[in-house]
Swiss-Prot record:
One of its GO terms (cellular component) is extracellular space. The lineage of its organism: Eukaryota, Metazoa, Chordata, Craniata, Vertebrata. It comes from Hypophthalmichthys molitrix. This is Gonadotropin subunit beta-2. PANTHER family: GLYCOPROTEIN HORMONE BETA CHAIN, LUTROPIN SUBUNIT BETA. Belongs to the glycoprotein hormones subunit beta family. It holds the Pfam family Cys_knot.
Length: 141
């Protein structure tokens, strides 16, 4: 009876390892990727659209079958590990409005808890190149 139980446990372990390997081999890893983003500022009539590097990809997460009101589930997301900050100037801002926007550029990424300081932690966010005002594409040299 003990041998049967051990064989079942071994089989379950092998299935879990196989599923993790299969899942991670078909989904893109968490890494820096080039993306078109838009930045805008209240008071400036145009948003600026340009290419930068963001973090994107798959992180292994666990969702418990039994959800207890006494325990908290922490999901890991693909987010910034190391960043560099760059500044762009928005076009046509009126006098008295600072036309500069500073944004993070991903140098490396990591699967960790979502930090609202550097990431959009919402379930369904707007696309990164969404503009509420008139678009102006930043020239690519």
């Amino acid at each position: 009876m003990l041998a049967v139980r051990n064989n079942i446990l071994l089989l379950l372990f092998c299935l879990v390892v196989l599923l993790v390997f299969a899942q991670s081999s078909f989904l893109p890893p968490c890494e820096p990727v080039n993306e078109t983003v838009a930045v805008e500022k209240e008071g400036c009539p145009k948003c600026l659209v340009f290419q930068t590097t963001i973090c994107s990809g798959h992180c292994l997460t666990k969702e418990p079958v039994y959800k207890s009101p006494f325990s908290t589930v922490y999901q890991h997301v693909c987010t910034y590990r190391d960043v560099r900050y760059e500044t762009v100037r928005l076009p046509d801002c009126p006098p008295g409005v600072d036309p500069h926007i500073t944004y993070p550029v991903a140098l490396s990424c990591d699967c960790s808890l979502c930090t609202m300081d550097t990431s959009d932690c919402t379930i369904e966010s707007l696309q990164p190149d969404y503009c509420m005002s008139q678009r102006e594409d930043f020239p690519v040299y």
